[in-house]
Amino acid sequence: MSEYQPSLFALNPMGFSPLDGSKSTNENVSASTSTAKPMVGQLIFDKFIKTEEDPIIKQDTPSNLDFDFALPQTATAPDAKTVLPIPELDDAVVESFFSSSTDSTPMFEYENLEDNSKEWTSLFDNDIPVTTDDVSLADKAIESTEEVSLVPSNLEVSTTSFLPTPVLEDAKLTQTRKVKKPNSVVKKSHHVGKDDESRLDHLGVVAYNRKQRSIPLSPIVPESSDPAALKRARNTEAARRSRARKLQRMKQLEDKVEELLSKNYHLENEVARLKKLVGER
């Protein structure tokens, strides 16, 4: 390439500038001649170098932008012909919404309510008279229900009686005594009757039937060598020995009681005989 021949990359062969694809080369000639003309041997990459003098590439920085946060006083309609005024909010309403106090509610005012609290209407009916007779009837009803262990299903509660209330109109009630709840387990008194007397033996205690075995018990032989079966056999044999020892002890105690009773009988007879001799002298 000679030094007098301009660069082929400086101009687009299609007739468009590399900076603007919608405009032709003829329209950009006047703009390019006013800014900077391409020199001989200049490549196409030099066209994309950003310079401070290029007004097309220069952009506004964020420092040049101004943001206006003020609320507009008017609003324009979509047709841009009429201007609609925006209503201003009351300062008291704004402060009530953004207040940090948890005791106040922005939608209601409690100053007027607190002053006239005595004039409020009661939610309950205070005109019902409560007398001491009503409370005494209620106490008796409570005592009767506590004394009965099993309440029948068809029991009807009287609707005319009143429960005791803390506020009484006639008089102040004395403190009611505490009612002791009966124990769930009631000990039954054992009365000795004819049936019980018939079950007593000659020693004055309850008789029991002693089973007399004609054949002694067979020895326990484990069925297998299973450890559980062996342990079960040993436990059964130990229980038999324990019952045998208990029966032997009971037999010995009965014999001892009979011996003591016979001695007591002889001693009483001896005392009676001696008293008789002393009385004769």
UniProtKB/Swiss-Prot annotation:
Species for this entry: Saccharomyces cerevisiae (strain ATCC 204508 / S288c)
Effect of residue 82 to A: In strain: CLIB 556 haplotype Ha1
Taxonomic lineage from the root: Eukaryota, Fungi, Dikarya, Ascomycota, Saccharomycotina
Effect of deleting the gene: Abolishes recruitment of the mediator complex to the upstream activating sequence (UAS) of amino-acid starvation responsive genes. Decreases RNA level of genes involved in amino acid biosynthesis and cofactor biosynthesis during amino acid starvation or methyl methanesulfonate stress. Growth dependent on amino acid supplementation. Sensitive to amino acid starvation. Sensitive to purine starvation. Decreases cellular glycogen levels during glucose starvation.
PTM entry text: Phosphorylated by the cyclin-CDK PCL5-PHO85. Phosphorylation of Thr-165 induces degradation of GCN4 by the E3 ubiquitin ligase complex SCF(Cdc4).
Region annotation Required for transcriptional activation: where it falls in the sequence: 89-100, 106-125
One Pfam family linked to the record: bZIP_2
Impact when changing residue 196 to E: In strain: CLIB 388, CLIB 410, CLIB 413, CLIB 630 haplotype Ha1, K1, YIIc12 haplotype Ha2 and YIIc17 haplotype Ha1
SMART domains: BRLZ
Annotated stretches, region: Leucine-zipper: 253-274
Molecular function per GO: chromatin binding; DNA-binding transcription activator activity, RNA polymerase II-specific; DNA-binding transcription factor activity; DNA-binding transcription factor activity, RNA polymerase II-specific; identical protein binding; mediator complex binding; RNA polymerase II cis-regulatory region sequence-specific DNA binding; RNA polymerase II-specific DNA-binding transcription factor binding
Name of the protein described by the UniProt record: General control transcription factor GCN4
Domain bZIP span(s) in chain numbering: 225-281
Phosphoserine modified-residue sites: 17, 218
GO biological process terms held by the UniProt record: amino acid biosynthetic process; cellular response to amino acid starvation; cellular response to nutrient levels; intracellular signal transduction; negative regulation of ribosomal protein gene transcription by RNA polymerase II; negative regulation of transcription by RNA polymerase II; positive regulation of cellular response to amino acid starvation; positive regulation of RNA polymerase II transcription preinitiation complex assembly
